[in-house]
Amino acid sequence: MIGRKKQLDTALEKQNLREAIEHGEISLGEAVRRMRKISGMNQKAFARKIVGVSPRVLAEIELGRANPTVETLNKIGRAFGYEVGFRHK
């Protein structure tokens, strides 16, 4: 039962994240932070296993103080079905 609830919670968190991104209501850094949290990883694990950067670089991205490459952003978003691109404002 607990496993099913966690799956539902994760699905809801992903839905809320997707809506926030689609409506432009969330910064890049906050989106990355929420993706990491939804994945259940700390910064160190997410940085090394998913993104392939140092934890410090990931922290800077989450704080909005980094200028990540498109490749890095695609690595972050890939697990959530996102890729970097332009959208009409």
Predicted regions and their residues:
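N-terminal flexible/basic segments that precede or flank functional cores
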Residues: M1-E30, R34
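Residues that mark the N-terminal boundary/hinge immediately upstream of a DNA-recognition element
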Residues: A31, N42-Q43, T69-T72
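Short helix-to-coil "ATP-lid" hinge immediately C-terminal to the conserved N-box Asn in the Bergerat
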Residues: K37
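Short alpha-helical DNA-recognition segment
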Residues: G40-A59
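DNA major-groove recognition helix of helix-turn-helix/homeodomain DNA-binding modules
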Residues: E71-R87
